[in-house]
Regions:
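A SAM-dependent methyltransferase catalytic signature shared across enzymes that methylate proteins
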Residues: 205-224
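Short, glycine-/aromatic-enriched active-site segment of Class I SAM-dependent methyltransferases
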Residues: 173-200, 205-210, 234-237
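A short glycine-rich, Lys/Arg-flanked "PGG" loop and its adjoining helix->strand segment in the class I
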Residues: 155-170
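Short, P/G- and charge-enriched loop/turn segments at secondary-structure junctions
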Residues: 263-271
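Conserved catalytic loop of SAM-dependent methyltransferase domains
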Residues: 219-247
Length: 286
């Protein structure tokens, strides 16, 4: 899922089954894979004339995630909500309608919002990493929607987040699940690998170990996740076909739509993880 034919290798830990990219690209070189044509930065505009229809789907996903925050964290006016790897910050935009909290987004590039600064002007968006948040900043809710698999130093990140959190802070993470049905089906073409941007691929066992090691206690692991599992499946199919992700997806819309209907009917009664998982954790009491 990148603009070159370069091959990348993943290895698996025999003890905890953590999958990791080795060798990893130097961070400077990695920037070439996060340009403004990167699909999450392009957002719904990647779908051309079907942008509005896809926007409705994205809005539904953002609302679903906001409702999870409401269910487990009860945000209020005094709450600080931090979205790490915010990309195109539509999730925070939805949170601004749901809650009267202070909303913060951080990403190492502004490619996700620089073209729509007026739209997102009420959000506190920052280019940088978590070390640039400041020692006095304390989030009540932290979300990492498909961020942690990109992080070169997840131990450091989670430990840092625990250090700036309060006793009531809740952490929400969503990542591809290596133990999922779609990974077993597509193997090396699985979109969850997303080389070379994804450096770690987690499963329920090792992500709980990782969180516990760095100051967090897992409350819930939802093996269904919030992202529609069809998205990962469709992207895997497109990987096999060699789709150029930098081009417009307008011509793929109806293929995507009809495929989704068939997928939904086929997987109507599936209870196993089909692609992603959501983890909710709280700060460990010392």
């Amino acid at each position: 899922m990148h603009h070159s034919n370069k091959e990348f290798n993943f290895f698996i830990c025999e003890i905890c089954n953590l999958v990791f990219l080795n060798p990893r690209l130097p961070l400077k070189e990695l920037e070439e894979y996060y340009t403004d044509i990167y699909l999450p930065y392009r957002g719904t505009s990647a779908w051309g004339k079907y942008k509005k229809l896809v926007s409705l789907s994205q809005r539904g996903l953002d609302i679903k995630r906001a409702k999870i925050l409401k269910q487990y964290s009860f945000p209020n006016k005094a709450s600080n909500i931090l979205d790490i790897g915010c990309g195109n910050p539509t999730f925070l935009e939805i949170c601004s309608h749901f809650f009267k909290s202070s909303l913060y987004g951080i990403d190492f590039s502004d490619n996700g919002w620089k073209r729509e600064q007026e739209r997102f002007k009420k959000l506190n968006l920052k280019v940088g990493d978590i070390d640039s948040l400041g020692k006095k900043f304390s989030p009540d809710i932290i979300t990492l929607w498909h961020y942690l698999e990109h992080d070169y130093y997840p131990n450091k990140t989670l430990k840092k987040l625990a250090s700036i959190s309060n006793s009531n802070t809740r952490l929400y993470i969503e990542v591809p699940n290596y133990d999922s049905l779609s990974r077993k089906k597509y193997n090396q073409n699985w979109a969850g690998f997303h080389t070379p941007r994804h450096t770690f691929i987690f499963s329920p066992k090792n992500i709980e170990i990782l969180l516990n090691k760095n100051g967090w206690q897992v409350d819930l692991i939802d093996l269904k996740g919030t992202l529609d599992s069809y998205v990962l499946s469709w992207m895997s199919e497109m990987e096999i076909k060699g789709l150029d992700w930098s081009k417009s997806l307008e011509n793929q819309f109806w293929n995507y739509f009809y495929g989704m209907v068939k997928y939904k009917l086929k997987h109507l009664f599936t209870n196993k993880s089909e692609g992603v998982m959501t983890i909710i954790a709280k700060k460990l009491e010392m």
